[in-house]
């Protein structure tokens, strides 16, 4: 089960990047229960976009109405800051929407876990949900083995990278690069007063996402079930070679000058200043940040999303699909609700939604033509399914991610060792 505290912290960090950068510079009640009579063809749909100008879900509702004459979907947009608690309160009171935007995982208000545990969500039984949506994208949308929701789009926990700028300076980092390829180039870049990466080293969500991106290749690439092994006591952070490799990669990059000067004490403002001024080529964030930054720049900046170059073996992408749709168990229109949710992940709608969000369409059979320009560099990795679920999406305690993030800051300052960090993560996991 996922803990959305981590998810939301990561999304908030992603929003902070483009906003801070100089680049940007009561639902209608459905009530009741199903009956043998013809279902009502009017349903309610609530969502809470992080960006007030985001119309992706309202467009989805209009598309469904256009394709299904006689159906009416009443859309209710709620502020993202209060959406989760508002949804939880409405659902508990029996007057929640028929369809709702939902966060996968559990542990906070308005998520699959909390609403599923309370028996408030409509089970999704259509076999296509399992056959058409890869397991990596369905992660966190079931409760006790029953599917209750589906993701709306997928993002890469990525290196947001200015490839044009880097190449103009003679620097090459791409989907085939290894960590050694990066390390070899860092000293020359540093000598020019620049860095390959900008890092908010004092901010745990940023140091954390970077390190998990590396561990996706060193830990989860070879063993996709590592989290299950950790939960069952078969392994630990400290005993896993891949976790040592991931943290050693951070130490090596720091020594080679791959981060901007003062990275250990830097915050998001420093990161965005380095990126927007052309002093750094890339930073670490969910890939939806590419669209936000490009839109804010009026098209003057072109970025791509890359996975992190692995220090050992294949490069694996880290995917997260934490925002999706679910239905209300008390809806009077369960067939209509399930059909609308199924429609949301149809190829045409999934592609349209992803384009609006700057993300990747839901679904397992993607070709390069399905992807936005910023994903073309990783199109082959996606086609080859060379990816894993963002590891933290399966961690049950946010303290583990915080121990990683703060621990990496300690590595950067020299106040902690790799063993110190991994022992702290194990302690947080077992607490």
Listing of model-derived features with the role each one plays in the protein:
Residues 1-44, 66, 129, 427-431:
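Short, low-complexity disordered leader/linker segments with a strong preference
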Residues 230-263:
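Glycine-centered hinge/linker elements that transmit conformational signals in sensory
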Residues 357-364, 377-430:
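C-terminal capping/gating helix-and-loop segments adjacent to ligand/active sites or protein-protein/ligand interfaces
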């Amino acid at each position: 089960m996922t803990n959305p505290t981590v998810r939301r912290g990561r999304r908030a960090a992603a929003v902070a990047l483009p906003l801070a950068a100089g680049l940007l510079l009561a639902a209608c009640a459905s009530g009741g229960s199903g009956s043998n009579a013809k279902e009502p063809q009017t349903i309610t749909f609530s969502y809470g976009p992080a960006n007030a100008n985001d119309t992706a879900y309202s467009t989805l509702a209009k598309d469904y109405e256009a394709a299904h004459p006689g159906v009416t979907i009443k859309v209710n947009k709620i502020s993202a800051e209060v959406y989760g608690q508002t949804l939880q309160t409405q659902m508990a009171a029996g007057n929640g929407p028929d369809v709702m935007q939902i966060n996968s995982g559990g542990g906070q208000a308005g998520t699959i876990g909390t609403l599923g545990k309370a028996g408030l969500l409509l089970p999704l039984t259509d076999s296509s949900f399992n056959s058409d949506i890869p397991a990596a994208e369905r992660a966190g949308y079931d409760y006790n083995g029953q599917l209750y929701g589906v993701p709306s789009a997928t993002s890469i926990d990525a290196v947001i990278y200015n490839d044009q700028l880097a190449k103009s300076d003679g620097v090459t980092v791409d989907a085939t690069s290894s960590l050694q390829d990066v390390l070899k180039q860092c000293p020359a870049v540093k000598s020019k007063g620049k860095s390959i990466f900008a890092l908010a080293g004092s901010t745990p969500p940023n140091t954390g996402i970077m390190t998990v991106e590396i561990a996706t290749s060193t830990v989860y690439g070879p063993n996709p079930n590592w989290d299950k092994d950790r939960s069952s006591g078969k392994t630990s952070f400290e005993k896993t070679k891949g976790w040592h490799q991931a943290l050693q990669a951070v130490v090596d990059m720091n020594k080679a000058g791959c981060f901007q000067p003062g990275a250990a004490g830097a915050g998001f403002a420093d990161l965005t200043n380095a990126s927007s001024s052309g002093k750094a080529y890339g930073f670490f964030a969910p890939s939806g940040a590419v669209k936000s930054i490009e839109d804010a720049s009026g098209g003057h900046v072109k970025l791509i999303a890359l996975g992190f170059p692995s220090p050992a073996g294949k490069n694996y992408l880290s995917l997260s699909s934490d925002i999706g749709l679910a239905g209300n168990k008390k809806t009077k229109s369960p067939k209509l609700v399930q059909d609308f949710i199924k429609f949301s992940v149809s190829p045409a709608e999934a592609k349209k939604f992803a384009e609006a969000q700057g993300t990747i369409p839901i679904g397992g059979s993607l070709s390069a033509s399905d992807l936005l320009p910023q994903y073309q560099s990783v199109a082959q990795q996606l086609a080859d399914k060379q990816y894993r679920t963002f590891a933290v999406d399966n961690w049950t305690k946010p303290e583990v991610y915080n121990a990683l993030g703060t621990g990496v800051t300690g590595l950067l300052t020299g106040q902690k060792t790799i063993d110190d960090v991994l022992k702290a993560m194990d302690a947080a996991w077992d607490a």
